[in-house]
Amino acid sequence: MSKRDYYEVLGLSKGASKDEIKKAYRRLAKKYHPDVSKEENAIEKFKEVQEAYEVLSDDQKRAQYDQFGHAGANQGFGGFGGGGDFGGGFGFEDIFSSFFGGGGGRRRDPNAPRQGADLQYQVTLDFEEAIFGKELNVEIPVEDPCDTCKGSGAKPGTSKETCKHCSGSGQVSVEQNTPFGRIVNRQACSHCSGTGQMIKEKCTTCHGSGKVRKRKKINVKIPAGIDNGQQIRVSGKGEAGVNGGPAGDLYVVVHVRSHEFFEREGDHIICEMPLTFAQMALGAEVEVPTVHGKVKLKIPAGTQTGTEFRLKGKGAPNVRGYGQGDQYVVVRVVVPTKLTSHQKDLLREFAGQEEQDDSLFGKLKRAFKGE
């Protein structure tokens, strides 16, 4: 079953502002939340709204989605996903705190598995490397589970203990006086930071965090045809997960150096070829550089400057495997700045012959001279 357009899911136009996107999400998330909605397919709609907001609320994800659709958002050319949290501290608890007064929403289990954070790595390629693809070994700083304590944070030979202040629940009850009477709210236990567990003896390597900072070498395959600004997702190569959760993803953002001769427009390559007046007037066969090697191009007699020739299949491969682009050669006449006396005489002779030309151009030229 094909996915619905994210703008359609939120009931917005493609030009919607961030504020409009946020308001639409809050309204629909409240409407379809399983704890509130009685609709039969509320869970599916809630997940659909969540997914749409996660993409459209992020500038980078939204740009990729607008350009590539769902393929860009979900198949390696999208933005940063998978963490479960939304930017700016806005999540499900915010919805319920605004509607139900602070503690009424479902609270996330602090000990539940959570996916690790995504990472971003910038790489710069030469023009040809982007065309043909490349395999890179990159070194990135990551937080991995501590080998000494196996990620527990506790000193080897010891274990975490149940927090005595919250009895392992990770939450404590707090009474609050309001105009409506006394209300009991549940909030995260400050002693165990909401985990329900405490470390009596911390691991000396990670100091109780369960993680250590290290540099990790990762092999990245750059696909042929990738363009400037596109990114590659390497699944599971981000930060380590929490409480046994999966690792985040690594996003490699590609920058491509400009080329002195070639320019790129999508899968097509554009270049300008300088030719002499004689070559364009009389016709010639010239060698044209391409990223695939030199090819011969026939220039017909009488070719005008600015004429464009197409070299089929000599462009960049489509990054998704949808065929091959072409190369377009734009010819430009080069006017010599230094001439010998003989060359000048020949040009004067040619100019004199042009005066006697009975072609339309010649007639027009004489008409403007009043002849």
UniProtKB/Swiss-Prot annotation:
List the PROSITE patterns. DNAJ_1, DNAJ_2, ZF_CR
User: Which Gene3D superfamilies would you find in this protein's record?
Assistant: 6.20.20.10, DnaJ domain, Urease metallochaperone UreE, N-terminal domain
Q: Which UniProt keywords apply?
A: Chaperone, Cytoplasm, DNA replication, Metal-binding, Repeat, Stress response, Zinc, Zinc-finger
Q: Which InterPro entries match?
A: DnaJ, DnaJ_C, DnaJ_domain, DnaJ_domain_CS, HSP40/DnaJ_pept-bd, HSP_DnaJ_Cys-rich_dom, HSP_DnaJ_Cys-rich_dom_sf, J_dom_sf
A GO BP entry: response to heat
* Ligand binding (Zn(2+) 1): 146, 149, 203, 206
- Residues in CR-type zinc fingers: 133-215
Location in the cell reads:
Cytoplasm
- Pfam families per the UniProt record, alphabetical: DnaJ, DnaJ_C, DnaJ_CXXCXGXG
Gene Ontology MF terms: ATP binding; heat shock protein binding; unfolded protein binding; zinc ion binding
Give the intrachain disulfide bonds. none
Annotated Zn(2+) 2 binding lies at: 163, 166, 189, 192
Subunit structure, briefly?
Answer: Homodimer.
Role this protein plays: Participates actively in the response to hyperosmotic and heat shock by preventing the aggregation of stress-denatured proteins and by disaggregating proteins, also in an autonomous, DnaK-independent fashion. Unfolded proteins bind initially to DnaJ; upon interaction with the DnaJ-bound protein, DnaK hydrolyzes its bound ATP, resulting in the formation of a stable complex. GrpE releases ADP from DnaK; ATP binding to DnaK triggers the release of the substrate protein, thus completing the reaction cycle.
Q: What is known of its domains?
A: The J domain is necessary and sufficient to stimulate DnaK ATPase activity. Zinc center 1 plays an important role in the autonomous, DnaK-independent chaperone activity of DnaJ. Zinc center 2 is essential for interaction with DnaK and for DnaJ activity.
Q: Which family does it belong to?
A: Belongs to the DnaJ family.
What name does the UniProt record give this protein? Answer: Chaperone protein DnaJ
Its gene is dnaJ
